[in-house]
C-alpha cells in the first residue's frame, strides 16, 4: 500500500510536465512562465508546511479560537476575537508552531516531521500515547496502518482526514 501511494504521488507530479499534456502545449509568455516543481523536491519541513496549509486553510474570524492555519489561541496571546491574520502573518505563525512540534520530536530524527504534522493536527498528547510513537520507539518502521488510523472525528471515520493522513505519509515518511 505504501509503495502504491508513493507511486501515485510520483505519477501525479510527473503528469503536469509530460509533453503530451494539454497544459504543456499552450503558448505562455516568458514573463508568465513558472517552473512546476514537485512537492517531493522540497525539504521535509517545507513539504509539511504546504500540506498543513492545504488542509487547514486560512481560518476566518468565525473560527475563533483558531486563527491563521489552525493555531489555537492560548491565554495571554495578543490575538483578539474577530481578528483576521494576513497570509504572511498566518504563514509565520504556522512555521513557529510547527517548529515547536518538530523540536518535541527531535530525537526521532527523520520521523520528526511526520510526528510533528500529526501533533499539529491532533495535539502532542494524542501523539505521545499513539501506537505510531510506540512502534517507532520499538524500532518498527511499519507504521502505515497506525498512522492512517488517526482519521476519526467525533467517533466516525472522516474522508478528509484520511486523505490528509495519506498525503502526509506519502510526502513525509522516509523508509
Language model feature labels by segment:
Residues 8-14:
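Bacterial N-terminal signal peptides
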Residues 1-4:
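Positively charged n-region of N-terminal signal peptides that target proteins for export
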Residues 21-61, 71-104, 125-175:
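Long, amphipathic alpha-helical surface segments
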Residues 45-49, 109-117:
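Alpha-helical scaffolds flanking conserved acidic
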Residues 9, 113-117, 130-133, 166:
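A generic structural signal for well-ordered alpha-helical surface patches
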Residues 14-21:
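C-terminal segment of classical bacterial N-terminal signal peptides
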Residues 120-124:
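Short alpha-helix boundary/capping elements
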Residues 66-68, 114-119, 144-146:
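Structural recognition of the beta-strand scaffold that forms the well-ordered cores
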